[in-house]
């Protein structure tokens, strides 16, 4: 989804509504998180989508401009953001 597509979808919603993202490790649960991070990144499309790993991979360079929406208190956020910024970590 492009930013302009997300903006169009959000423009159809109550501007006072809270933006939620799926809670992780909550299989079948109703727990969610309030999104509070928006980070510029680059990503590439994966050849095969997987319902556990997604359909894109963050890369440090050479990808398409992307925006990551997250929650700062997720226990994996810090490591994810660090890994996404280290060039030699790309596979």
Which residue stretches match the model-derived regions?
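Detector for the mature cores of small, proteolytically processed
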Residues: 15-91
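DNA replication sliding-clamp ring fold and its partner-interaction surfaces
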Residues: 2-12
């Amino acid at each position: 989804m492009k930013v302009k597509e997300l903006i169009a979808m959000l423009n159809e919603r109550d501007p006072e509504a809270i933006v939620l993202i799926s809670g992780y490790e909550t299989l079948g649960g109703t727990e969610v998180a309030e999104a509070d991070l928006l980070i510029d990144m680059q990503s590439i499309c994966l050849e095969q989508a997987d319902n556990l790993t997604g359909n894109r991979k963050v890369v440090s360079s050479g990808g398409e401009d992307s925006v990551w929406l997250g929650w700062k208190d997720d226990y994996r956020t810090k490591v994810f953001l660090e890994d996404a910024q280290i060039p030699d970590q790309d596979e």
